[in-house]
């Protein structure tokens, strides 16, 4: 199995277009090797030829340009991307579909909830259904795509930002709102969870002893943006666990015996993005890596 991290940041990328917080300022200036990041997405392949895109980032074209394995290989029109799977209906997971409207065949896999969101917005009709088949999946039921077995499962989260005003106050939404994904090539198994609001018993059981987990690294602390004075929203309000703290991700994973743990979907304010920071040192000392754009993993 090959995995390429196309993008590693949360919504808006790093730095966000209007952000001047300390973490973002380093990225603007590229100080001390600080890396800029596009919005989170990975590409996965069982054979190095057919690729599955997990979430379609608004930065899709930039990510393709940076990834030769995903360039056209033959004929006048071609793409090694054979399928796209969506783990939520968030803007930073679906907007990239609009950059995939050039009549290129691929399969689009998503929950019925997310496919309904796409169907309700006619702008996504530009992704021609004659070429792009929209295929609903069932939670916890494996589907085989390009030699990979993909199993979507529910995790705690919330409705997409653009649907909050229509949620009737139920921000958590349905079980199909926020998903994780197990990726299996019969020899290796990887879990991809870019958004998660809480660690549950079911999730602990699923991840215990895992070979590799990509996990929500949005914020270092729950009130990070509040303390910076740029938002009144906590991580919990946005549907994300924080990395630090007694209920945070580092603590939650400590007893799970996961061999390799990588934070992804990192918000532009997160101090862990600074490789010189004490937060980064704490994450590394706890056995965590911080994803960066272009990271490649071969299993």
From Swiss-Prot:
InterPro entries: Metallo-B-lactamas, PQQ_synth_PqqB, RibonucZ/Hydroxyglut_hydro. Gene3D superfamilies: Ribonuclease Z/Hydroxyacylglutathione hydrolase-like. Keywords: PQQ biosynthesis, Transport. GO terms for biological process: pyrroloquinoline quinone biosynthetic process. It comes from the Bacteria. It holds the Pfam family Lactamase_B_2. The keyword Phosphoprotein does not apply. The keyword Transport applies. Pathway: Cofactor biosynthesis; pyrroloquinoline quinone biosynthesis. Coiled coil: none annotated. NCBIfam families: PQQ_syn_pqqB. May be involved in the transport of PQQ or its precursor to the periplasm. Belongs to the PqqB family. HAMAP family: PQQ_syn_PqqB. This is Coenzyme PQQ synthesis protein B. It comes from Xanthomonas oryzae pv. oryzae (strain KACC10331 / KXO85). The lineage of its organism: Bacteria, Pseudomonadati, Pseudomonadota, Gammaproteobacteria, Lysobacterales. The gene is pqqB.
């Amino acid at each position: 199995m090959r995995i390429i991290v196309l993008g590693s940041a949360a919504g808006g990328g790093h730095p966000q277009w209007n952000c001047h917080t300390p973490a973002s300022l380093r990225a603007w200036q590229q100080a001390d090797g600080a890396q800029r990041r596009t919005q989170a997405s990975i590409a996965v392949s069982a054979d190095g030829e057919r690729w599955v895109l997990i979430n379609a980032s608004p930065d899709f074209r930039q990510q393709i340009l940076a990834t030769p394995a995903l360039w056209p290989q033959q004929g006048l029109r071609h793409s090694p991307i054979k399928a796209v799977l969506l783990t939520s209906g968030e803007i930073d997971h679906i907007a990239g579909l609009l950059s995939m409207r050039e009549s290129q065949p691929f399969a689009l896999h998503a929950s019925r909830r997310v496919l309904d969101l796409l169907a309700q917005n006619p702008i996504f009709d530009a992704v021609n259904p004659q070429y792009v088949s929209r295929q609903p999946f069932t939670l916890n039921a494996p589907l085989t795509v390009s030699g990979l077995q993909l199993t979507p499962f529910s995790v705690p989260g919330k409705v997409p930002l653009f649907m909050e005003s229509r949620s009737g106050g139920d921000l958590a939404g349905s079980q199909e709102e926020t998903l994780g994904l197990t990726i299996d090539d019969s020899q290796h198994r990887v879990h991809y969870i870019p958004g998660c609001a809480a660690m549950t018993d079911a999730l602990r059981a699923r991840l215990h002893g895992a070979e590799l987990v990509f996990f929500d690294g949005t914020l270092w602390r729950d009130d990070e943006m509040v303390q910076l004075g740029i938002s009144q929203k906590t991580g919990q309000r946005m549907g994300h666990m924080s990395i630090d703290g007694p209920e945070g991700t580092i603590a939650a994973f400590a007893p799970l015996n996961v061999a390799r743990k990588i934070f992804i979907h990192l918000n532009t304010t997160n101090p862990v993005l600074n490789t010189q920071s004490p937060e980064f040192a704490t994450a590394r000392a706890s056995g965590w890596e911080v994803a960066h754009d272009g990271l490649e993993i071969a299993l």
